[in-house]
């Protein structure tokens, strides 16, 4: 039985699309007799015409990916976009290298493990990029007999 007109009117009343209007198949005769918006409203109140739930977008896949990223996954070369300097800027990389070096030098100077002159020399070397890491600097100091144990 064709109730497309009633569905169209119901869609206007319910403020939704025609596809979201559900008509009870057992009461098609009643629906067929409805020709005004008021008739349709009565059928809606009786539960013969119902507005279907809107279909959403599942966020399950998104949550799964977020969980993996939180664990540090999905960071391989195939996932990387942009240049090396775009992912971690050169300045940030430099700051992450120089700050621990300067902190180490300061601690050694305050605890009098190194002399002021060698502190200044090492400070300038660090600024020049001579050391990759704290361990590299310590190795240099041991090899050159700067570090007083």
From Swiss-Prot:
Part of the 50S ribosomal subunit. Residues 55-69 have a biased composition (Basic and acidic residues). GO terms for molecular function: large ribosomal subunit rRNA binding; structural constituent of ribosome. The keyword rRNA-binding applies. InterPro entries: 60S_ribosomal_eL19_sf, Ribosomal_eL19, Ribosomal_eL19_arc, Ribosomal_eL19_CS, Ribosomal_eL19_dom, Ribosomal_eL19_dom1, Ribosomal_eL19_dom2, Ribosomal_eL19_dom3. GO terms for biological process: translation. Keywords: Ribonucleoprotein, Ribosomal protein, RNA-binding, rRNA-binding. The gene is rpl19e. This is Large ribosomal subunit protein eL19. Residues 55-93 are annotated as: Disordered. It comes from Methanococcus vannielii.
